[in-house]
Regions:
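Glycine-rich beta-alpha junction loops
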Residues: 9-11, 59-60, 84-87, 188, ...
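Conserved N-terminal subdomain of the carbohydrate kinase-like
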Residues: 48-131, 295-311
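Short beta-strands and strand-loop turn motifs
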Residues: 103-105, 130-138, 165, 182-186
């Protein structure tokens, strides 16, 4: 079983428009609404890959019902802890003319320390039966500064591989706690470390304690910096579609590969292929495995020794 901690669950709303023009009116061609947030999206892709998974997180208010109902429809097991306030909405406006998505992310409800204690207790009860853990998404208001450290150390105490996909100080905390994999995108990595070069910034996170750093490069694919070496993988062509769930699909592939003990080049190839398959879907957290299998042999993985990478 692969567990996912989704600290900031969302109700994801996706609007598709012909072309996004700021300051003008738009006719929405398609609307999607589903349970989301990065951790939920990762869990959805893991389930599509055939893995048992449980989502742990927080929900509150009127939107909580829509979230839990959608999880039930999708067959996703969950332990969502009730908090005061309203589960946030995350709105993506996808421009069909170029495939770019503009995101509007609410902050989410305040989560007090007592609710975090509850989540950690539930996680600890499940970790003995788990093969891996993903902690994915932003941390909600009220979260203690060391929340990521506690989650990573809890997984380590049970010898469970952990991947963390978050930003800012929490990313540095995850690295310092010795996370097996951290997965920032290029901009997040550079901003968080204050280092101007991707390879050097990844090296800095590894110096702080992260065992491996996988960097999303957008349309350029992904790069992995690991104890076994460094590789870059790229999709065969730029894809038009909805990119909002591509990073979450990649995280699912990476943790599935880690749980299976796959070599790093294979993990990276699968991550880029699954990410590309996710772009073709209208909403995040969904993949068509036929697309994934079609992309796998097209992904070029190269070992690299360069001191830097372009964004």
């Amino acid at each position: 079983m692969i567990l996912t901690v989704a600290p900031n669950v969302a109700l994801d709303i996706t609007y598709q428009v012909d072309q996004l023009i700021p300051g003008s009116n738009h006719r929405v061609r398609r609307v999607g609404e589903r349970a989301g947030g990065k951790g939920v999206n990762v869990a959805g892709v893991l389930r599509a890959l055939g893995h048992d998974t449980v989502v742990l997180g927080f929900v509150g208010g009127e939107t909580a019902g829509a979230v839990t109902a959608d999880l039930a429809r999708g067959g996703l097991a969950h332990e969502l802890i009730a908090v005061e306030g309203l589960t946030r909405r995350s709105i993506a406006v996808v421009d069909s003319s170029n495939g770019e998505a503009t995101l509007f992310n609410e902050a989410g409800p305040h989560v007090p320390a007592t609710r975090w204690d509850d989540l950690e207790a539930r996680l600890a009860a499940r970790l003995p039966r788990a093969t891996a853990l993903v902690v994915s998404g932003s941390l909600p208001p009220g979260t203690d500064d060391d929340a990521c450290i506690r989650l990573v150390r809890l997984a380590a105490a049970h010898r469970v591989t952990v991947l963390v996909d978050t930003v800012g100080p929490a990313l540095l905390q995850a690295a310092a706690a010795g996370a097996d994999i951290v997965k920032p995108n290029a901009g997040e990595l550079l901003d968080t470390t204050g280092v101007g070069d991707i390879a050097a910034a990844a090296t800095e996170l590894r110096r702080r304690g992260a065992k491996a750093v996988v960097v999303s490069l957008g349309a350029g694919g992904m790069a992995a910096f690991t104890p076994e070496g460094s590789w870059r993988a790229a999709p065969p062509t730029r894809l038009a579609g909805n990119p909002t769930g591509s990073g979450d699909a990649a995280a699912a592939a990476l943790i599935a590969g880690a749980a299976a003990g796959a070599p790093w080049p294979d993990r990276l190839r699968d991550a880029v292929a699954l990410s590309a398959a996710a772009v073709l879907q209208p909403t995040a957290g969904i993949v068509d495995l036929r697309d994934y299998r079609r992309f796998v042999p097209q992904i070029l993985v190269e070992e690299h020794h360069a001191s830097g990478l372009d964004r």
